[in-house]
């Protein structure tokens, strides 16, 4: 799938090729892994200064949101649609208009799925002082409770949405992925072809009535009479 961008200023046409699945997946996984390392560092630093699990959960939740927003929204907005690993793999996120809004919609699609999992599951683990009790709270089917059922339902729905996303993503090589269709963006290869815009010459195709067959100009009639 090719994307053509016409520049009216210098009369050129840029032709981009949509990125392959392996490049997009590798860039995204490496970017997420990088943010996970930063979150682990924040976790260790916070834990060294405080044993309050609720404070630890609050710090990690805020840190996750801030890191994701800065790295996946603001950085691509100011860096031509690229993150660190997108730049290394020579791909970028392209949008024709409303770039900030398009990028935000593109990244929020995945951020919501991962954040809901983090907030729903991690909240109880960080607040509860006994991790084994927390695990038993979710896995004990003999004593079902409303909270556990709700969390399981949300987890199943999110997992189902993730399977749809991954399945569509696997068959979208050199095409738009699902979140790109929803945000009207394109993950393209940085290398592109530059061509001159073809110019069409405007010609006046209206015929002169005097030259049409069967039409005689008035001055010619006067010459014949005289």
From Swiss-Prot:
Record keywords, A-Z: Cell membrane, Membrane, Transmembrane, Transmembrane helix
Disulfide pairings: none
GO annotations of cellular component type: plasma membrane
Residues spanning the membrane: 25-45, 54-74, 107-127, 153-173
Topological category with respect to the lipid bilayer: Multi-pass membrane protein
Compartment annotation: Cell membrane
InterPro entries in alphabetical order: RDD
Keyword Transcription part of the UniProt annotation: no
Endpoints of the signal sequence: none
Name this protein carries in UniProt: Uncharacterized protein MG243
UniProt lineage: Bacteria, Bacillati, Mycoplasmatota, Mycoplasmoidales, Mycoplasmoidaceae
